[in-house]
């Protein structure tokens, strides 16, 4: 079952934690690629100095952050790596959750090809398929084309995992500072990164 629009409403930190254990799905050329979300970071503009929308900054890139919750915000870093975010909070409140890492589930062969251009990979390469925001976007074929797309779409959405299959019973949710935001002054220390402690696909321990 797809997460309904109401799933993305409410406090961004709570939505971030709710996203853990759910399945991010992207259909590419009719083939389902997916992964279980194991690591996220919350960004709470306009007061969060780490957020692209800090101070209410409104640009062509960030405009989607000011829109309705439950849409995709995709951007490039270093001019080459895509990052996928879920927009949260009410219209006009520019907040979102960065998906930092996944455990691959569906379309494994396509994911391997997308990441390594081959399907015969080592155990170390397998562990590196989706353990970072840029890696998971490449693996799932998420690009700037997906910016602004509703997560109610048939081709890009979050699937809710039934409680009996949910991995939250196997891993403890841990909170800590976000990664690679040295520019963000006091916001560097906000414990707004949430992840499954000990999960092999988490990007950093």
From Swiss-Prot:
Q: Does the keyword Metal-binding apply?
A: no
Q: Which SUPFAM superfamilies match?
A: FMT C-terminal domain-like
Task: Tell me any Pfam family this protein matches.
Answer: Pur_DNA_glyco
State its Enzyme Commission number(s). Answer: 3.2.2.-
Keyword annotations of the record? DNA damage, DNA repair, Hydrolase
Report the GO molecular function annotations. alkylbase DNA N-glycosylase activity; DNA binding
Output the InterPro entries linked to this UniProt entry: Formyl_transferase-like_C_sf, MPG, MPG_sf
Enzyme class label: hydrolase
Listed GO biological process terms: base-excision repair
Q: Which family does it belong to?
A: Belongs to the DNA glycosylase MPG family.
Q: Know the name of this protein?
A: Putative 3-methyladenine DNA glycosylase
Q: Which organism is it from?
A: Bacillus anthracis
- Top-down, what is the taxonomic lineage of the species of origin? Bacteria, Bacillati, Bacillota, Bacilli, Bacillales
């Amino acid at each position: 079952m797809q997460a309904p629009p109401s799933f993305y409403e409410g406090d961004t930190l709570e939505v971030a934690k709710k996203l853990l254990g759910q399945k991010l799905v992207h259909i590419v050329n009719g083939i389902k690629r997916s992964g279980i979300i194991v690591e996220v970071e919350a960004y709470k503009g306009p007061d969060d100095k780490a957020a692209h929308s800090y101070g209410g900054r409104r640009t062509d890139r960030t405009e989607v952050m000011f829109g309705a919750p439950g849409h995709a915000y995709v951007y490039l870093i270093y001019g080459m790596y895509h990052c996928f975010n879920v927009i949260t909070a009410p219209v006009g409140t520019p907040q979102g959750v960065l998906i930092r890492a996944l455990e691959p589930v569906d379309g494994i062969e396509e994911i391997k090809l997308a990441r390594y251009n081959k399907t015969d990979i080592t155990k170390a390469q397998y562990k590196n398929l989706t353990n970072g925001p840029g890696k998971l976007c490449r693996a799932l074929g998420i690009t700037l084309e997906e910016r602004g797309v509703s997560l109610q779409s048939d081709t890009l959405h979050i699937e809710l995992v039934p409680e009996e299959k949910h991995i939250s019973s196997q891993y403890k949710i841990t909170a800590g500072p976000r990664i690679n935001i040295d520019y963000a002054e006091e916001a560097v220390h906000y414990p707004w990164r949430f992840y499954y402690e000990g999960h092999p696909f988490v990007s950093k321990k």
